[in-house]
C-alpha cells in the first residue's frame, strides 16, 4: 500500500477498487434494488387479489397473520401484502382491486415477525382499509 508524499492517486485508486467488496455499495452502484423492486421505485401500486393467505409469525410469537397474494397491474408480478387492522381481512375478497405500499421495515424490508412480507394493503376498491375497519366507510359494490 502506497503512503508516500505523492501517493494520493494510488491511494484513491486502491480505495475505489476495495469499495466493491462492500455488498451495500456494490448493490447500490449496480442498481440491483431498483431492478428487483416489484413496484419499480413507486411508493404505491395497484393490484388484483388472487387469494387470502395466513402466514405464521416468527418465534417467539405465535399467530397467523392475515395476508393476501396480490398480482400487480403494472407488471404482473405477484407479492404478499399484510392486512393491518382487527378483522380487516373480512373486507377483502378475491378479485378486489387493492392499493399496496411498503410495510415500513428496516432498509425497506419486512417488518417485525412477518418474514417475507414487505407490503401492506392501504385501500380496497378505492376505499381506505382503515376506514372500513373503523366502520366510517362502506366498501363499494363492483
Curated annotation (Swiss-Prot):
GO BP term, pick one: translation
Keywords, sorted A to Z: Ribonucleoprotein, Ribosomal protein, RNA-binding, rRNA-binding
One Pfam family this sequence matches: Ribosom_S12_S23
Ribonucleoprotein listed as a keyword: yes
Biased composition (Basic and acidic residues): 11-32
Record-level GO cellular component terms: small ribosomal subunit
SUPFAM superfamilies in the cross-refs: Nucleic acid-binding proteins
Keyword Ribosomal protein applies: yes
GO molecular function, one term: structural constituent of ribosome
Annotated Gene3D superfamilies: Nucleic acid-binding proteins
Region (Disordered) residue spans: 1-44
Superkingdom: Archaea
Recorded family membership: Belongs to the universal ribosomal protein uS12 family.
Subunit structure: Part of the 30S ribosomal subunit.
Role played: With S4 and S5 plays an important role in translational accuracy. Located at the interface of the 30S and 50S subunits.
The name this protein goes by in its record: Small ribosomal subunit protein uS12
Species in which this protein is naturally found: Haloquadratum walsbyi (strain DSM 16790 / HBSQ001)
Gene for this chain: rps12
Amino acid at each position: 500500500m502506497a503512503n508516500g508524499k505523492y501517493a494520493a492517486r494510488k491511494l484513491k485508486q486502491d480505495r475505489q477498487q476495495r469499495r466493491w467488496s462492500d455488498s451495500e455499495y456494490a448493490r447500490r452502484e449496480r442498481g440491483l434494488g431498483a431492478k428487483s423492486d416489484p413496484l419499480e421505485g413507486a411508493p404505491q401500486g395497484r393490484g388484483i387479489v388472487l387469494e387470502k393467505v395466513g402466514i405464521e409469525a416468527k418465534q417467539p410469537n405465535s399467530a397467523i397473520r392475515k395476508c393476501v397474494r396480490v398480482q400487480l397491474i403494472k407488471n404482473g408480478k405477484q407479492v404478499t401484502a399484510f392486512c393491518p387492522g382487527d378483522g380487516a381481512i373480512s373486507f377483502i375478497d378475491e378479485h378486489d382491486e387493492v392499493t399496496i405500499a411498503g410495510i415500513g421495515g428496516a432498509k425497506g424490508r419486512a417488518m417485525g415477525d412477518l418474514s417475507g412480507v414487505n407490503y401492506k394493503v392501504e385501500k380496497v376498491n378505492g376505499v381506505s382499509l382503515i376506514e372500513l375497519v373503523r366502520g366510517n366507510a362502506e366498501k363499494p359494490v363492483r
